[in-house]
Amino acid sequence: MASEIFGTAAIFWVLIPAGLLGGALLLKLQGE
């Protein structure tokens, strides 16, 4: 059970920053 929670948390720790960076890149591309 604990390993599942840790695995899910790890996925979010990767996806959230990746999503923020991806959104920033899209805004920069649209701005140009």
Curated annotation (Swiss-Prot):
Q: What does this protein do?
A: Component of the cytochrome b6-f complex, which mediates electron transfer between photosystem II (PSII) and photosystem I (PSI), cyclic electron flow around PSI, and state transitions.
Cellular compartment(s)? Cellular thylakoid membrane
User: To which protein family does this belong?
Assistant: Belongs to the PetM family.
Keywords on this record?
Electron transport, Membrane, Photosynthesis, Thylakoid, Transmembrane, Transmembrane helix, Transport
Is Transport one of the keywords UniProt gives this record?
yes
- The protein's assembly and partners: The 4 large subunits of the cytochrome b6-f complex are cytochrome b6, subunit IV (17 kDa polypeptide, PetD), cytochrome f and the Rieske protein, while the 4 small subunits are PetG, PetL, PetM and PetN. The complex functions as a dimer.
One cellular component term from this protein's GO annotations in UniProt:
cytochrome b6f complex
**One GO BP annotation here?**
photosynthesis
Q: Where are the transmembrane segments?
A: 5-25
Q: Which InterPro entries match?
A: PetM_cyt_b6/f_cplx_su7
Pfam families, alphabetically? PetM
The lineage's top-level taxon is: Bacteria
HAMAP family reported for this sequence: Cytb6_f_PetM
Per the record, the major location class is: membrane
Q: Which gene encodes it?
A: petM
Q: Does the keyword Electron transport apply?
A: yes
Identify its membrane topology class: Single-pass membrane protein
**Which GO terms label this protein's molecular function in UniProt?**
electron transfer activity
**Protein name in the entry:** Cytochrome b6-f complex subunit 7
Source organism per UniProt: Prochlorococcus marinus (strain SARG / CCMP1375 / SS120)
